[in-house]
Amino acid sequence: KNNNYLSYDMAKDQSSYRYRYDDVQYKNTTKLGALFNWSLMKGTSKYEFRNFFNQRGTSSLSQREGTDFYSDQNIRKWESLYTGRTTYSGQLSGEHKLREDMNKLDWTLGYAFAAYKEPDRKVVKSLESTTDGDSRYYVSDPTRYYQDLKDNSASTALNYEHKFAVSEMFTPVLNTGVYGEFKKRNFDARRFVYNMLGSGYDRFAEWDYSSVFSDANISTDRIYMKESTNKSDSYTSDNLLGAAYVAAKLNWGERLNANVGVRMEYYQLKLDGYESDGIKPVHLDQNATDFFPSVNIAYNLNEKHQVRLAYGRSVNRAEFREIVPYVYYDFALDANITGNVNLKNAYANNMDLRYEFYPAPGETVTIGGFYKRFDNPIEQTYMEAGSGLQYTYHNADHANAFGVELDIKKNLDFIGLKGLSFVFNGAYIHSRVYFAEGSFERDRAMQGQSPYLINTG
């Protein structure tokens, strides 16, 4: 079942369908993976070279039948799709211990490649027409899509740790480091529409998916292919991230421990493409410098009981797909999805207070409360686009989330199941997202946020 609803009808106290479909999907996936890791120990130094490769191919055929209530038509739809995903990541790293383990230096060089291809995606829609009581389905604008995406990224990191032997009761540790990453994306897509000539339309009214794309049907009196590729169907983008941090682990005796630090990040995003109309060029160049402090304080009441207080600030940067103006048709949603070049980064302030109980080795009981404040949270929203559905992304004003969480880990030795444990995690979350004055959106729960989460095993 694949249903979509219009706004709730308060007068009739009922939901109204936008569409109501029955979907059937056939899918086959093949995977190929390779892993190669190499390490070398030399004195107080350790070197590692890690490689990971994955290739995944998926072939799928989707068939749909139902009613589009917005256009008041019965429809049938087919999608044939092959997707190929390739990922590779390689990392060369080293770790060096200096001065009797009082100092440690580690570094990393990395490269990653990712590719996604849809070499020939076919979509066919048929609309029902009734004449003199005779119902027939007429093929409407069969379409073929081709798209190719490539990501290349390089990264480097350097970290240093120094231990201070001030006294037996006070042994602070200083950590500092830098990080850099550069990522570049190239995206190209093409779109072709099969147009039926007037003289041959009725003859091919009830074509099905298996025959409509046959090369034998391409002729001057039947079907011709028309390219409908837009300038917005291709874009290039890159982002640069530079970061530095300093942190300290502090302890006062055996009861009080604290981890404090701050991380500075410089981020630059560039995008070259066109708006969805294919006329107006888009040249995006954004940069920002942010600071992210963090504090984690733990107080040991005794060997089995501990109270922990934590605070941290984080960022949720918009992904490429959330920014680019490329319009992608999602068959499952029966809707177009496009990005928003005006999207802002979202920031979160996180606070956490927990009580921790350790009844036995390997066992824990933790209960706590948390609060999160989000500024400019990114959410997917509906936008008007004629008779079809279209979604994009936008920033809400702010959002809050708070709740309680319970964690339990219990060994099962007492019932004869040695080596096995029972684990439980449950949370209640209340969230609310707020929109600026004048917005068509109403304040509501955060998108995709469930009020209850339970994991056990």
Predicted regions and their residues:
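Short loop/turn motifs that connect adjacent beta-strands in outer-membrane beta-barrel proteins
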Residues: G43-T44, R99-K104, F164-V173, W252-R255, ...
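Gram-negative outer-membrane beta-barrel transporters
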Residues: F370-R373, Q390-G457
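Signature of Gram-negative outer-membrane beta-barrel scaffolds
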Residues: K12, S16-Q25, T143, Q147, ...
